[in-house]
Regions:
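Catalytic cores of secreted/periplasmic or lumenal enzymes
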Residues: 192
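Short, structured beta-strand segments at or near domain termini in extracellular proteins/domains
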Residues: 24, 220-222
């Protein structure tokens, strides 16, 4: 027969609230068919159920932080803290992509500035082998440097495409509503446009992309949550 309903997990799209109706059919252990409807009311949490520092001020990120924590994509800075305002580094972001997408360890060659015994070395080596992480000049990756928003978008697009998905470069016109669209570097233009068109990137309350700005851990969580549930 089919699995009991208690064993079925429903994952709503990031940011969704309201009533979800799920029609189901199945067979019991004797082969008899059954069907029905499950109604689930989805509400937005006001704080994290795991981390004390993801409270009312970060209610917009709470569901995403908890989702990624349960999925094994992120960890806290300790058992009860997430440090949501802390800027995420390039190395840490690649590690989260590695966990989120199950990147394969296709190689051991990494970058000159990534120590082999660092906690993100395996993730960066895999990302390099898959063409996701290309680094900068001189064979370096700058893993401890803050990640810019446009570089995060480029890494996400490459990861999706390298793992069987398809996220083509978007149209430049999709950025027309953002006041700072001219600040997007040419190398990231297609990726930024693609993520905007897909609804993953929405900009800030002032209508800006802030492409060269850093990305906080809370912002990272909301973006990755949207990517994984889109």
């Amino acid at each position: 027969g089919t699995p009991p309903l208690a064993e079925v997990v429903f994952v709503p799209k990031a940011g969704y609230t309201g009533l979800a109706r799920l029609n189901y059919t199945g067979t019991d252990k004797n082969g008899a068919e059954f069907s029905g409807v499950v109604e689930i009311t989805i509400t937005a949490p006001t704080s994290s159920g795991t981390f004390a520092d993801v409270g009312a001020n970060y209610s917009w990120a709470a569901a995403s932080v908890d989702y990624l924590y349960r999925a094994g994509v992120v960890t806290g800075t300790d058992a009860t803290h997430f440090a949501p305002a802390q800027n995420i580094t390039r190395g840490d972001f690649v590690l989260m992509l590695y966990r989120a997408f199950g990147l394969q360890n296709a190689g051991t060659a990494s970058f000159a500035d990534v120590p082999q015994d660092s906690y993100y070395a395996q993730a960066i080596a895999a990302a390099k082998a898959m063409g996701i992480a290309t680094g900068g000049g001189g064979g370096t990756f700058n893993p401890t440097s803050p990640l810019t928003r446009q570089d995060a978008m480029l890494l996400i697009q490459r990861t999706i495409n390298a793992t069987g998905g398809s996220l083509r470069d978007g149209a430049e016109a999709s950025l027309s509503t953002f006041a700072d669209r001219g600040n997007v570097a040419p190398y990231a233009q297609g990726a930024v446009s693609a993520l905007v068109q897909a609804g993953i990137i929405k900009g800030d309350n002032a209508g800006r992309l802030n492409p060269t700005g850093s990305l906080s851990r809370a912002e990272m969580a909301t973006i990755l949550h949207r990517v994984l549930t889109m």
